[in-house]
């Protein structure tokens, strides 16, 4: 089993949870759940990079992904540490598609060894995040 907290410095983890609570109407429990899901997603995207899986998180988890990306220093350092010195690009698509990619991505994360908070992912199964098809990004 993989644990998202093992991939993020405790101080950075606490900071991202605080940023989520500052910017959104989330309590600490919800902010922690979201950041857990975001880290699981990002690490899986790194692990599966180049495989053409077209991973895409839903809008709910994407809130925490964007919060981390906007904390650029910490996101850059995380990419550097876990992606062999490279930077995991985020290239959102303009239009949303509804192709089942959110559900597929949650299963890829589970298959990669992370515990999936299915309720967070299921909320967006009928939707799609704005990830570019056929890109090596997230």
Task: Give residue ranges: language-model regions.
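Intrinsically disordered, low-complexity, repeat-rich regions
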Residues: 1-138
């Amino acid at each position: 089993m993989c644990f998202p907290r093992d991939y993020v410095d405790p101080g950075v983890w606490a900071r991202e949870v605080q940023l989520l609570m500052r910017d959104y109407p989330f309590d600490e429990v919800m902010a922690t759940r979201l950041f857990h899901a975001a880290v699981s997603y990002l690490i899986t995207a790194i692990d599966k990079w180049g495989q053409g899986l077209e991973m895409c998180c839903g809008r709910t988890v994407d809130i925490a992904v964007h919060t981390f990306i906007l904390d650029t220093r910490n996101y850059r350092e995380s990419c550097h540490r876990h992606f062999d010195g490279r930077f995991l690009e985020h290239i959102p698509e303009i239009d949303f598609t509804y192709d089942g990619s959110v559900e597929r991505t949650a299963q890829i994360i589970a298959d990669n060894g992370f515990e999936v908070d299915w309720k967070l992912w299921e909320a967006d199964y009928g939707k799609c995040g704005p990830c570019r098809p056929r890109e090596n990004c997230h």
